[in-house]
Structures are given as structure tokens and as C-alpha cells.
Amino acid sequence: MTETKSITLPKAADSPGIGVPQDGTSSGAAGLSDASPLLVAAMTAGYEVVGSAPAGLPPGGAIGVASGISGPETEIVVGAIGNGEPAAAKPQKAKIRAKKTKPDAAGAKQAKHDLAEGKLAKHDVAEGKQAKPDMAVAKQAKHDMAGGKQAKPESLGAKEAQPETAGAKKAKTGTGGARETKPAGAKKLKAKSAKHAGAKLPAAKGGTPKDAASAARAAHPGKAGVKGARLKGGKLKIAKKGALKTAKGIALQPESPFDLSDSQWYLNRELTWLEFNRRVLHEAIDERTPLLERLKFVAIVSANIDEFIMKRIGGLKQQFGAGMHELTLDGRTPRQQVIECHTSIREIHARKREAFTEVRALLEQKGIVIESYATLIPKEKKFLREHYYANIYPLLTPQSIDPAHPFPFISNLSLNLLVTLRYPRAKEVSLARVKVPVGLGSPRFIRVGKGDHFIPLEDVMMNNLDMLFPGMHIVACEIFRVTRNANTEKDEEEADDLMAMIESELKERRFAPIVRLEIGSGMEPLHRGRLAAELELDEENDVFEVPGMLAMRDLFELARLDYPRMHDPAHHPIDHPQLLTTRNIFHTIRDARQILLQHPYVSFSTSIERFLREAANDPKVRGIKMTLYRTSSQSRIIEALLAAAQNGKQVAVVVELKARFDEATNIRLAEEMEEAGIHVTYGVVGLKTHCKVILVVRQDYSGLRRYVHIGTGNYHAETARIYSDVGLLTCDETIGQDATELFNYLTTGFMARRNYQALVPAPRLLKKALLARIEREMALHAAAGGGLIQFKMNALEDGDIVKALYRASMAGVRVDLYVRDTCRLRPGIPGLSENIRVVSIVGRFLEHARIYYFRNAGAEEYFISSADAMKRNLEARVEILCPVIAPELTRELRQIFDTYEADQRSAWDMRPDGSYVQRHPADGESGEGTHQMLIAQAERRLKESLKMKKKLPQR
């Protein structure tokens, strides 16, 4: 007897979702609502259409596909179909009969085989719910059959697809309707490189990759009629018992030849971050970089490695010290990671010394000299001795190291002299420690003689120790430096007072375990061993002997010297073309609806600071709310908030006290604001508040109106000049409502169900939204081709996102990733990631913006976010994903991606083994990097705007 099953999708819900205007018009929003790819995918899987398509079915529609259909004959009943058209009164039917033939070239297997093998995905096992991408919520078939319930259409703010549980088996996916995912003769790659935990992988192909967007548009010219899918709450109902196990909003796909749980497909987070520092160090070597900028990059790498040792190595040592041996996604234990990181750090240090030696010699030719004490003339030595006695000697505190005196406390990152001395007639020697007083107004480099000649402070001290130890014989003087663990966080759920707990952590951090000892070359082995023992370090692994200068991060002092020709060309951020006038900024935003800000190309002062300054003084402004993660110590942002409170406005600030290395500043600012009457809260217990949001409520002519700023970067005037970020000024009603919901959550911590219509917050929804959109792009690509995903972020570390991108590549979707530093994904592996490119931009500014793009069958979606694709951002922080819809703004974001693609100066292409190769301009090509091009684009937009204003009639 023939077994028959039906799937019914009733009329779609009317509630708009992310990126959907309130008037119901399509803007390329979020999901799947049309119908014909169901038939396409079923035929791909080996089914034959024997009836006519449902009445009203558009030729290029798309709906979720019921994967796992089995049985000799299946009926598919389609209700709401088309692009928002109402459903027919009586649903039409299309019959599909399974063929006894092999799958097509895509390698898609029949669902019956999938069921027999038990390899269908099981999402939300605990709750028995089907994944709910975007706005459409379809309960799992098995759950519906058991309970007889039907899911109500929900907006994006409702619950979305839960990430796969650890025990759930992953769905085997591949290329639907395309070529075989496993190339002919391809063999499973075996892990070989201990450094990168990877396989012996093919080298990256030469040449510059083609424009992905153009390639995607050209891929299927005959299918331009396929419109972007939208999730509008279609309800999935299983009308008959049978073997249908799951219903997913993706096309049927072949079984993957790659085991995505295999560690060889993933790179190590720590090692890829260190690889990023090799690219930064290359800027110090590159002769195209101005000389003092090269010195700056030496200092940057030194500071980066210091912070890495404090945060990452310190944390890893805590793990294996506590007996933790859990493997990472790439198959390493904490101890293995520390050992390999130390090896990489030693290599970077060696290369850094070579770079510094070269730059130092070139600077000498320009008259900037770092002297050694031995080369000074007597007159200069006399000057330095007098300077030492007057300005350094009073700050010194020598400490003896002997049985009568305990080993002294050594502060984090401090330079220290270990002095060996004895009395003139004594044979025994004694040891003393002297801290080099760098900081708090004391420079590391002292100017000597005429011109720009400098000598390190420690050199001056070493050669004038007789003043500090009169009557003693100085036997030797050696230098060392320590680095302490910065991971001292406590469980804030157990704290009665969060601020008091953070203050306690700061005190403990001063005395945290030491994780690295750096010593100058030539230190006595006995002294080296004694220091390691006193500091409780492994002498073999934790002690770094450094030839030459220690603490090269202090070279920032010299890199700031005023030599314009040895710096990058001066850059002065422009005023945004729409913010040039002195007109009330709220009137400007109201007329423009949305304004996109690109920092540092657009002035932070005349945009964001002005926004807050005018809000503080505008009599029509009723309230101001904002999040504060990092800001400068003398901040105009804080001044504006204090002024607003003094002017009687309601001001609420969510201060993140746990912003690493900014805790003390944030505590001081929080106390200052509380004293001024500002409502200060510290976010949600257990989560860091990392989103960047300002909400201003103003009494407009039509009632209260909400004005919002959402950004990817901190409200920090200094970093806004050197970090590349984007932000959005808007008075969009939906975004304003969502911002209000967000602040209600942040100021109370209540986990009540909140209905977000435009914004997508983490940790509840953001990761699910990204995964759902990746799956949707796969489904649309299977139906019509031309799939394209582009992400711009600082780091790609989350395992679920990486696996989803692998599946997208195997399905034929083009994936362009612009990732600044950490990237766990291996691009360019045939059959697995051959459709993925990873590019890192390293140049004048620090890339910091997060932009997410989905082609969505032509109804493109753009988002900006405070979140990277990292587990901590997506699951342990409060973040925001914000849609950018206005065509004039999406054109700007598209121009950013196109600029990255055109970069032949500061772009690095990632190879499958985790290494990178820098692009170089061919003959006749521009040698400008991304940042130079974006500066020129911003200035060009300003000039065009000024020309247009001159043409307008004067009022």
C-alpha cells in the first residue's frame, strides 16, 4: 500500500522582522517564505514531480524544505506561497514520487537512506523543538505529532534556533544541486604540523582573488527572478504518520566526506593570534612604511605580546595547574598550547630584534640616535650624572636580597636591576634589587647632547650605581623583567557588591602569579636559577633570555617624535557631510532618518561627542541612556553626561566594570557619575556589557521621539583616531523601541521575554540569527545559485560558526571573510573550504569594525555589530547586531568590502595551513592600502557634498 504524507504551510504572519519596514514592503529580510525550491530540492534528492505545481506558485520562490521525506509517494500541500501573496482558500497539491535512481551529480542521497543511517540532524533535543531561523518558527515534526500543537508565527525577537547540543549528531551537509563535494582522488588530510595542528595542505594559489560579488551575480544570469527569502512564520504541520523525522529550512544535501569534528580542520586560537603579530611586525620591516611608523610597529608587537602573556598564557597555566586537560577544537591540551606559544613567541622576539636593529641604524642616518653610555663624551656623562642625582636618585629604593630580607615584591612589567656587590675587603658578595622608575612622568629615554640623541634610563642607572651604594664594589649589574597573570576574576554571582569585588580583584592582580621572566643576555646561570626559583617559574620554559633592549613597548616615546616625513601623511578626520552645519543635530537626524559614520575617517568629536553634547543642553531632551565599556580618562563623553544630569535630565549609564585593564578607570568614572546624580548600573550578572549604544529621548513636535547611536567601537576619543569602526545615528522607531528594551534588560537583569523587532542581541539571539542566515544562504544557493556571505570582523573563533561556514562552502556558497587576527578556519581545502577566502588587513589603523553581509538571493542584508564571531561574544556578553537598510548607507558598506578586495598593499591572503601571503600590486596597479583608499573616499564624499550645497538655491 502506498504511504502518503502531507505538509501544510498556512498563511504567513504579518509581523515584520529584522530589516522589514513597517509598511510590509520587502527589504530583503530574514528567511524562507516562498515555495518552489522544495520541488527543486526534492528532485535533487531523487524524487520525481508527477503533478502540476500549486496554483500561484512563483517560478523562483523559496520555502523551507522538509528534509528526510521517505516512502514511495509523498504529497506536498502548500498554503501561503509567493512573495507575501495570500494563500488560496483550498491549498493546491503537487505529488512527488520517489525514483529508483541514483542521486544527481550533487551527490544528494535519498532521505530514506539518511533515516536508515540515523544521520539526520536533531536540533533542540531537550525541548523537542525544530530550529527556528529568523522570524519563522516551525516546531519539529515529531514534537507536533505528539502534542498536536502548532507554532505561532513569531518575529525575530522570539526564540530562534538553539545551537546544537554536545550530544546531538550533526547533519551531514554538502552541495545541493551542484558538483560532488569530494574531488576526484582527494584523500583525507592528516595532521602533520605541530605548530598549526593541521594537515599537509596545498599551498595557496597565486594571484589576486576575483571579486566575489561580481562572480556571484554572474554565476546564474538566468535566475535573476529569484527574490530574497523572508521568514514570515509559515507553520509546518505533519498530516500523517510516517518516517518523517525532521523538517529543516534548507535544501536536501549530500552526505559530507569530511568529519567536521576532526581536529585537523581547525587552527588554534592562540597560535593564529600570534600569527597576526607576525603580520604586524612585517610593517616594521616593510620599506614602504615610514621610518618612525616602523619603530611604532616594533613597540606595538612588544605591547601585544606582553598582553598576550598576561591574559592568554596566564589563563592556560591556570588551567593545567588546576589539572584541566580538556582538548581544544584543534586537539590541544592547555600545556601543549603554552609550549607551542612559547616557541612562537621566541621566534617573534628574534625577528623583532632584527627589525629594531635595522630601524635603529636607519634612524641614526636621520639624526635620531639611541646612544650607549660607553660612546658618550665626558661632557655628556657629566650632564647625565647631574640629571641622575637630581631627577632619578630620589626615586630609587634599593632592596637587599639575603636571609635577613625576604625576596622583594616585583611589580608587573617593571624593569629591574639585579646588582651584585661586596665590601672592598670582603670575599662574599651580596645581591640587591633596584627598580627602574619608568612611568608617572619619568621617561624611558633621556635626551642627551644636542639634537635627538637619547639614552635608556637603565643605562644611566647602571653607570652611576656608586652613588646608590657608596663605598661598595660593584661586581656586576644585570637586568630583568617579570610578567604577571591578569586572570584574577571571581564569581560575581557570589558578590554582594560588584564594585567592591572588582576593586578586590585589582589588588589581587598586583600580586598575581608570575608567568614570565625576561632577563638580559649574559646573566649568571646562578642568578638566573635563583630568580626562577624565587618567582616559582620553570627555568627551562618560563625564562626568556633577551639580547639587547627589554621592554621595547617603551619605544612609543621615540615613535612620537615630530618628523613629518618619517610618519604617515597627516590625517585629519572630516566632518560628516550631513553634519557640517550648526543646525540642531536631532533635526538633521530626523530628516536623514539614518546616518552612517566611518571612523577614523569621520570625526568622532563632531559626530558622537556632538550628539551627546547637544543632548545634554537641548531643553527638549528628556533622557539619555548609554553603555560604557572603555573611554578616555579625560573624556568629553563623561563631561556631557555630567552636564546633562546638572541640567535636570534623566541620565542612566551602564558601566562595564570588568573591561580588562580599564577597571580602575571605569570604577573612578562610575563613582564620579553617581556623585553627580546619574543612575549608574553595572550590567547583567555573569555577562560583560560589550555593546555600544546611546539612546536619547526627545520631545519632538509629534511627541516623544527616540534617537539612537549604535557602533562597533568604544566611546573613546583617542582610539577613535586610530581604530577603524562604523556606527549608525538613527531615529528609526523600531530600532528605538528595541534600544529601550535593551536598556530595560541591562538595568534590571530580568530575563523576561522581550520582543526585538530590528536589533538582535547576544547572548540570546545573535548566534542563532547568524547560523540561521548561513543555512538560509545555502538553501537559496541550492535553488538559484549565486550564494554569497561576507563577514568583516576581528576574530573568527566560535566552532559552530566555523562549521556552518564549512557547510556553506561545501554547498557551493561563496564565503569571503575579512578577519583581522584569530581565525580557526582553514580556507581553500578542496571539497571542504574551496569556496572560502580569508583576508587580513594590517595597516595604518587597527581594523575594528564588524560587518555581516548575506546576498539573500539579491535582497541583500547588511548588519553592523559590536560582536566578533567568538564564543565569548556570542554566549557570554551582551552584544548587538543592527541592520543597515537605507540604500545610500548599504552602498557605503559595499564600498568598504570592495575596497578590501581591491587592496594590494595591506591585504594578506590566508593559506590552508594557517600561514599568510601579502598581496603586492602588479605593474600599473595602485599601491594604496585600504586605509589610504578609505581616507580618499571620505574626502571625496565631502567635496561632492559641498559642491551639491553650492548648487542649491540660497534661502
What are these regions (language model features)?
Residues 801:
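Polyanion-binding catalytic cores of nucleic-acid enzymes and NTP/SAM-utilizing transferases
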Residues 2-24, 28-51, 64-68, 73-79, ...:
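N-terminal localization/anchoring segments of enzymes in phospholipid and broader phosphate metabolism
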Residues 42, 74-75, 83, 109, ...:
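Positively charged, lysine/arginine-rich intrinsically disordered segments
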